[in-house]
Amino acid sequence: MIYADVIIDISHEKLDRDFQYRVPEELEQSIKPGVVVTVPFGKGNTVRKGYVIGISTEAKYDASRTKEIQGVS
């Protein structure tokens, strides 16, 4: 399993950090730092634009609660 560290495109001081998302198998070849992605964000899973800033093979958080990248923009 591959995970991407993503900065969400929202201006808010509490969101000034990265969030980790699972990378679906079909997108593994496309995901790299600098790529723009669409991700579900927040309790309502609102679709937001984000920027990949890093890739990892280990989850920083509980992998079962990690959301999945929806697509590449």
Where are these regions (language model features)?
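Terminal, basic amphipathic appendages of nucleotide-handling enzymes
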Residues: 1-73
